[in-house]
Amino acid sequence: MKILKLFLPIAVSISSLFATWFDDIPRTITQPNGEIIDCFVTGDQYGRRLHDANDFTMIMNPEDGYYYYAIPGINNELIPSTFIPGTVDPKTYGLEPGLAMSLAEYNRNKDFYHNSESERDSRDAPTSGEIAQINVFIRFADDPVFPNPRSYYDVVFQADEGEPSLRDYYWEVSYNSLWVNTFHFPGSIDDVNTAYQDEHPRGYYQPQSGTNPDGYQNDNERTQREHTLLANALNAISSEVSPLTDIDANDDGYVDAVSFVIYGQPGDWAELLWPHRWSLYSQTVTINGAQVWDYLFMLSESWYFNVGVLCHEFFHVLGAPDLYHYDGGGSPSPVGGWDV
């Protein structure tokens, strides 16, 4: 069956900010001295961890910006040890593999996003007919231009008929009753993937540390920066959206579907630079009279930018919940091959 090509073992949890769970995704981090460390990331938007091939967790020390192997703190929170990955064998020093964020901390992160939204967090887009999705490309002040043409990024949204894409997936699983058209902004000339360029560098949207003094310091500051970024991008392209495009098919006063593709790769630990769905509750942005609320947030230059992740996040736009329960340990148990 063609649909099964798109199912990925991605797990998730019920909340107002919907997340995407990944296991053992290869990552490369650079220490302040320039040393490169090949590692993996496991987790989701609420909490994730970097770890080596033997599952020993690594964490940044915000004082010097270096990554160290993690150890349990007094209250079982993860804190950096004095052992730098690549310089010691963690087994020799009795370190414990598989250390993860505590369930209490994970739930605190989840509750923050849930409690910060209003009653509109339960609104859903239409599940039949046609949906016009607005997608905005964004790069930061210190980013290069997107390396691939617009047609390359468009494929995951709406490939040719019969090929895996967001549009094809929902057309098939809805028994030919839901058709999703995606309109990309800013407009493209000669297939160049133009993007809204923000005034701040990438580090502004990452946690503060000894090597990133201008980063955000807490969840409230992170929220303000993310929402301001997206509001500015939307205001910059809003005049390009044709009034003939029906972006509010169910006439509830809200844009049915909005997504953002941010240049670069996802961040580490609980950074905002991670695929997620949220709502623009702290800003008031309208396009042709409809307010922007729900949105999808994607990163462009990595394995994460694929049909499976996009389809997973879009299910939340339609009102579907996440399908796993984090227990403070290893990988959660999703619903197997039926999850996307």
Predicted segment positions?
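N-terminal prosegments of processed precursors
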Residues: A19-R123
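Sec-dependent signal peptide recognition
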Residues: K2-S13
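Active-site-proximal segment of zinc-dependent metalloprotease catalytic domains
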Residues: P97-L99, L103-P334, W338-V340
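A generic structural micro-environment signature
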Residues: F7, E35, G43, P144-F146
